[in-house]
Amino acid sequence: VFLAGRSEESETSETPLMKDAAVKIYRIRTGNFTRMSEYIIGDPRFSSIRHTHKDMIFAWTKKEFSNLSRAREAGLTVPQPYAFDRNILVMEFMGENGIAYPQMRQILPGSPEETYNDAVGIIRDLYRKAKLVHGDLSEYNILTGPEGLILIDMAQAVTLEHPRAYNFLFRDIANINRFFEKKCSVCDPHELFREIVGEEFFEL
């Protein structure tokens, strides 16, 4: 990920303001094809793509743009996506003065109990409001910003129609529990899963 300046018109001035943007470039030759295909194949949004390495990389880039847009529209705190082209994604830089905000594993924004509840809230809101499952959630892809937790790395996130969406959801819950279980009391993962998806899921 590279840091770049982005010109943005101010609502109160005709003078463009420079706003930092992150440019993420997925390498076509070294991308993990097997890992990507696990999340792309089965996602109805990408059912028509060819399963070549290059097309998978391009779909992966488009997928992150789409997932970030969807999560942001649902009210989650994620980087704002600006544009994408083939294997290049431009989005909001989450940091200050060119320095990225720390990962949650490095700094908690509040007490362990409060932060755990906030992290669980991210999983819940992503599922209920954005109708997405992150699929690879951990203390490494949640940042601690000045106003709380920020969710990043959304390329692998899947819609609820993906055949493995609920396996991924349980894994996300288990990963967050693993990180917090030595810091505070955590919910039983099966009970938390049931609470997030709702009782109607088990009545299908």
Model features per residue range: what roles?
Residues 1-100:
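Conserved ATP-binding subdomain of kinase catalytic cores across diverse folds
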Residues 94-102, 156, 180-181:
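Active-site catalytic-loop/activation-segment of kinase and kinase-like phosphoryl-transfer enzymes
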Residues 111-115, 119, 127-134, 145-204:
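C-lobe/activation-segment region of protein kinase-like
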Residues 83-84, 138-139, 192:
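Proline- and acidic/polar-enriched loop/turn elements at helix boundaries
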Residues 87-88, 141, 148:
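Structural motif
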